[in-house]
Amino acid sequence: MSNDTLDLACRYAALIDDRRLDELHTIMLPSIRITGPGYVMDTLPEVERGMELLRQYERTFHMVGNQLGAWGGDGVWSGETYCIASHVYQRDGAKWKLDMAIRYQDRIVRHDGGLRFASRELRLAWVQDLPLTMAR
């Protein structure tokens, strides 16, 4: 596991959870491609617009876990990043939590003195939607 690539994945999680979508350019190429079940986003502006949909949730919490991959001779890191993405929302006057177990297929490159996502493919392992008891 590369600390730099794991750090990039953690920065993605923090930017998404904090809704700092205007900073996504610091971790993604302008030509970023993000795909998942039923969607494709082919540029950074498309990703920024697509991530606006997360504002429907009261909060999100992305827990980044395992990361396995390697740098290729072409200067591209290819690997997999595990994540549990929790989404808190209201349903019928109660709080609910939608959890998604994700295995991102990532391609990362060096760009402007740092690392940037070139692509992310979101593969779902499972989804769970349950009532939530909030901590006090």
Question: Across the structure, where does each feature detected by a protein language model lie?
Answer:
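Short, low-complexity N-terminal intrinsically disordered segments enriched in polar/charged residues
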Residues: M1-D22, T26, P30
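Residues at structural and domain junctions
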Residues: A9-C10, R33, R55, A94
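Alpha-helical elements of Rossmann-like donor-binding domains used by nucleotide-donor carbohydrate transfer enzymes
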Residues: R11, E46-R49, R103
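A solvent-exposed, acidic/Ser-Thr-rich amphipathic alpha-helical stretch
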Residues: L21-I84
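A beta-strand edge to alpha-helix "cap/lid" segment located at domain peripheries
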Residues: Q56-R136
